[in-house]
Structures are given as structure tokens and as C-alpha cells.
């Protein structure tokens, strides 16, 4: 008689960790990261930069107006960053309010970065444990967590095309690689520089005809963004100023700013995350794919010179670096010590983030301090937002954290934010009262003074003036 398989058998028991790895990672991400961010969004916790910018872009983008004017940012969306990947998230606005369309879109892009790895697993090229480990890096690393904690930015979305490109590179799927590059370039203009380095990598690998094609695509994209775009769309935001910051103090001062401990600690965290994989590769005598790792050079240079390692800036760097370990992970069983040590590093490097998010889950009525989920506060905000949304005529001056809630309304501006040069007179004012609300770059004292100034005007019609919100109609000029 043939014995039947038993769930308690040692072989079956050893398979359970591999089977559960990816579901547990996704569950932890959904509960400990996505849910707290969405709770905070529902409580109006996030400033106009960057959530309000991209929510207003999605709300106003259409076939008739593909490059909408963002009144609160005082720029056309593609004259700021060139990130046409936004078009893929635009259909969500049909079924969801703009702010939720943006948040759901960002979460979907982050989660879909795991899909190419699942495809490798289905083909028998990655073990379940390896897939779960890479997913943990992509979804739960400090860079990924802080990117979602600072919504929204298409740089975060670039994890998906970076993983697609890495898989296509290692499998020599040139068609897939080309599609991945187009999606990657559409996330932010800087990624076309990585295309130049990928051209070099392909040339070194002997794929010279395809290398020429990738090089042409990259150069055409760069020429379009930095040459044709200003000619067609008008002046673009000059982000090169960040790269030059500190040059007036001399070379030593310039380098000292970029080598400050706050920046080096971020680099150290990225290196530490990859240390177990690096040690394992050394023990297995698997050489890094130096050709692929060339794509990291432009991003490293831009982040070093621009002192930009936090939030969404680390996501593409980590995603691209992880793809350099595919030759190591392909067809190999990941040692337990790599899984455990990597998991512990992810956990402890996220200690502050997880503590904050756990407080949001367990004490959302009182935390975060500047935007508690107190029912009376939320009711005041809802009443104020409803009035401004119903009266769509006249410029409205809003607290920074209200821009995303009213993104589909014309003529909205943020207190303390960019303003028109024409000395705009605002018909509506809606702000939170300190100590609540997002007031940067102002102070709570200045916002209190502005409320007193607006209230004292003889022509002001005060509509809400409770403990939480100030809403008034009149003629207002002071905005900072």
C-alpha cells in the first residue's frame, strides 16, 4: 500500500515558509504601510508638496488638456518634471476621487513591481524564498516605506519598470527591455541618463546593434525633454540649481555639504540592506554583473550632487541594484542566514517608520499630532471643503493639506505656497487652526496672525470659525 502525503511530514513543513513568504510580505506591507498612509490621507495629513501637485494633475488631465495648469504649484505639470507615466493612472479618476486615485495608483505601481519576479518564479528561475526576499526589499525597505509615507511621486512608480528592465536584461529579452525603458523614462527625465549607461552595457555585452537602438532612444528622449520641451511647452523648472547648491562656498564646502552625516547615513542604510546578499555572492564566488550595474552611476551621481537620498529618491536606486543579484538568486536556494539577516536589517532600519505607522493604526484619533482623526476636526474639515467645492467661482486660498481634497476645483492656491505675480485677490479662505494642519513654509504663529488679519477685515463674511477651521468669504490678499 502506497503511503499518502502527510501535511506534518518534514518535507511539507519545510515548504511552508517558502509558500508563505510572499503573502506575508504583501500582508505586512498592506497593513503596516499602506493602511496607515491611507488613514493619514483621509485625515488630511499631507501637504500640497507632493500629494497635492500630482492629485491636481490627475484631476485636470484630459485629452483636451494633456498638460494641465496647476494653480497651486503655478506650473504646467510637464513643465515641472516630465513624467507622462501619469497617463496610466488617469483612468482611476473615473471611478475614484482624484486623491484616492493617486494613492491607489501609487500603491498598485509599488505592488506590481513584484509581478516580474512572480513570472520568474512561475518559470522555475526563482525560488519562492528568493521571490519573497526581493519583494520584501521592494515593498518594505526604508526607501520604499518612506516613499509611500511621502506621497505621491512617479519616481516611486519607477520600481516596476526597473524590475522589468532588470529581468529583461538578464534573460536577454530585448523587446521587453525596450518597453521597460520607455516606461522608465516616462517616470522622470533623469532615467534617460541611465539609458545611456545601458547602451554602454549592451555594447560591452556584444549586442551592438541593439545598443545603438537604446542609445538613440535615450538621446532622443533627452533631446525632447531638455531641448524640445521648453520650445513646445514653454520654460521648465530648473532643478539643476540643487546640483549647484553650495558651490559659491568653494569646493571643500560643496563636498562637505554632500558628505554630511545625514546623507552618508542614508547611503549606509542602502549598503547595509544589500550586505547579506553581497556576502552570499562572495561565498558563492558569483561575480557581480558589472555591465548592468553601470546603470546605477547616473542615479548615484544625481543623488550625491543633489543631496537627495530620502523618500522616493532611494526607490529606483535599490530596485536597480537588486536586479544585479538576479544571477546569484537564479536557480539557487537562498540560505536561511541570508533570509533572517536581511529581514532583521529591514525591520530595524524601519524602526521609526513602523513605530509611527503603528501609532496611526492604534491611536488615529490623537496621532499624528498635527492631523489627529478627532471626529470634530474631521467634521469641520468636511463642512469647509464642501462649501468650497460647492462654490466653484472665485480664487480660493487653502491650507496646504486641503489642496488634494479640492484638486478638481479651479483657482485653488496654498497658503505660503507659489502665488501669481498679479497680486491676486482671493475670494475664499479655508485653513486649519494651529496647532493642526500643514503650514510649511510658514509657522503656526504666522498662520494664527493671518487668521486674525482676515477675520478683522470689515468685508469678511466668516462662515466657519470653530476650534478647528477658519472659512471665510471676502477679499483677501495676505497669503504668507
Task: Please give the residue ranges for each predicted region.
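Transmembrane-helix motifs of polytopic, lipid-linked glycan transferases
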Residues: 100, 104-125, 133-135, 164
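Short acidic/glycine- and proline-prone juxtamembrane loop motifs at membrane-interface regions
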Residues: 146-155
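Extracytosolic helix-loop segments that constitute the early lumenal/periplasmic catalytic or substrate-binding loops
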Residues: 52-77, 84-85
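Hydrophobic, aromatic-rich transmembrane alpha-helices
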Residues: 266-293, 297-300
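Hydrophobic/aromatic-rich transmembrane helices and adjacent perimembrane loops
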Residues: 290-333
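Start-transfer (signal-anchor) and selected internal transmembrane alpha helices
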Residues: 1-35, 119, 128-131
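Signature aromatic-anchored transmembrane alpha helix within multi-pass, membrane-resident enzymes
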Residues: 23-27, 215-219, 330-358
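Specific aromatic-rich, kink-prone transmembrane helix
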Residues: 116-119, 137, 156-180, 197-199
